[in-house]
Amino acid sequence: MHYLTPDLCDAYPDLIQVVEPMFSNFGGRDSFGGQIVTLKCFEDNSRVREQVELDGKGKVLVVDGGGSLRCALLGDMLADKAAKNGWEGMLIYGCIRDVDVIAQTDLGVQALASHPKKTEKRGIGELNVPVTFGGVTFRPGEYLYADNNGVIISPSTLTMPE
């Protein structure tokens, strides 16, 4: 499904919250949306790997990486796995790498920046807990919509106006 966040903002002004404009679009999908699954991890993408191996149909993985700009929480192999397992997209409060390959992957990906270094693997991270960044709190089960205009969240599913 193709989403236009300005149209959703106009149609649902009382339902949406707009995430502060700090993310860049890196994925092969310019527009994505779905039910939020949250993950809080700092400079360790072990739990990201676990999540992308699961069925992600209709879901968006929101990763709170603490805003770290010191390593990448997502690379081409995990992005490919997420796409193959049906994930709609990922919003990463941190960095990614392998950006040229990810740009060709059928997955929405927004992140702060790119960084060539991989993370440590310590198996640390909290799944499906509320995470706060960009001026909003992302809650598991709520909905996220993203495109080149920005990122919005809503407590319920939104449909594009006609």
From Swiss-Prot:
Under the heading InterPro entries, the entry gives: RraA, RraA/RraA-like, RraA/RraA-like_sf
Name its co-factor(s).
a divalent metal cation
Q: What's its catalytic activity? A: 4-hydroxy-4-methyl-2-oxoglutarate = 2 pyruvate; oxaloacetate + H(+) = pyruvate + CO2
* Alphabetical list of Gene3D superfamilies matching this protein: Ribonuclease E inhibitor RraA/RraA-like
Q: Its Gene Ontology molecular function terms?
A: 4-hydroxy-4-methyl-2-oxoglutarate aldolase activity; metal ion binding; oxaloacetate decarboxylase activity; ribonuclease inhibitor activity
Cofactor notes = Divalent metal cation.
Per the record's keyword annotation, is Metal-binding included, yes or no?
A: yes
At the top level, the lineage of the source is Bacteria
General function of this protein:
Catalyzes the aldol cleavage of 4-hydroxy-4-methyl-2-oxoglutarate (HMG) into 2 molecules of pyruvate. Also contains a secondary oxaloacetate (OAA) decarboxylase activity due to the common pyruvate enolate transition state formed following C-C bond cleavage in the retro-aldol and decarboxylation reactions.
Task: Kindly provide the name given to this protein in its UniProt entry.
Answer: Putative 4-hydroxy-4-methyl-2-oxoglutarate aldolase
